[in-house]
């Protein structure tokens, strides 16, 4: 909504809203991600409540029972992220501005694809979304890794809609032997030393060559504009650094 110039429509946000920085100064925080006060949210008298993912299903149900209008997105791919931008643009009568944004992102993605097409070899990349249990191959990240010039070693799992479908074992990573390990643990810092010290991981190329990197969750784990801009830029710099 900020990118569309429609931020004046926002009456409340979650405490996990981090972009843009001024959002927390401009709008009241009325919920967490999973939990929220139906009373506080309803008191804002919103015309529409927008949420993301099946994880918010219980909160959405409570709000619906309180006679609120609720729209939950569950975008998982780059194409779906772009469609969400268009949908929100239509809702707030800013479709033209939304289309311009989408066009910019698509042009940037296409430029990246053309640039990396010149690479002779694509490094094998392992992305870790969470450590215990270990999850990988969240779809939009898997796609962005490919766009940035890498080869996601678990891309075959990326179409799994549920986290349990993307769970992996540490031995699987050893077998894949990635050249680069990227990690972004939502809600806590990545412990790179613990990754290095996992049984058998000392033989992985990424560990031997010290190519383990943490990525800020706010630019990679949120399937929105940030992942298509800052997230893609960071991925490209880390994957193509050599």
Where is each model-derived feature located?
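N-terminal ligand-binding lobe of clamshell/alpha-beta domains
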Residues: 1-242
């Amino acid at each position: 909504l900020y990118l569309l110039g429609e931020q004046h429509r926002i009456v409340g946000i979650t405490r996990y809203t981090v972009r843009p920085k001024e959002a927390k100064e401009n709008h009241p925080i009325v919920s967490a991600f999973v939990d929220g006060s139906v009373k506080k949210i309803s008191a804002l008298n919103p015309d529409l409540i927008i949420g993301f993912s099946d994880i918010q299903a219980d909160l959405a149900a409570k709000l619906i029972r309180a006679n609120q209008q609720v729209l939950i997105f569950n975008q998982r791919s780059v194409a779906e992220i772009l469609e969400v931008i268009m949908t929100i643009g239509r809702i707030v009568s800013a479709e033209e501005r939304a289309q311009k944004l989408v066009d910019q992102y698509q042009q940037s993605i296409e430029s990246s694809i053309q640039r990396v097409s010149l690479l002779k070899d694509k490094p094998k990349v392992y992305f870790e979304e969470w450590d215990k249990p270990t999850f990988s191959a969240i779809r939009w990240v898997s796609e962005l890794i490919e766009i940035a010039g890498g080869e996601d070693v678990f891309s075959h799992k990326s179409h799994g809609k549920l986290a349990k479908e993307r769970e992996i074992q540490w031995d699987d990573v050893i077998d894949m032997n990635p050249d680069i390990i990227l990690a972004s643990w939502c809600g806590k810092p990545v412990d790179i030393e613990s990754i290095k010290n996992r049984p058998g991981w000392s033989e992985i190329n990424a560990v031997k060559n010290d190519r383990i990197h943490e990525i800020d969750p706010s630019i990679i784990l949120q399937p929105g504009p940030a992942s298509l801009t800052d997230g893609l830029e960071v991925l490209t710099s880390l994957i193509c650094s050599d």
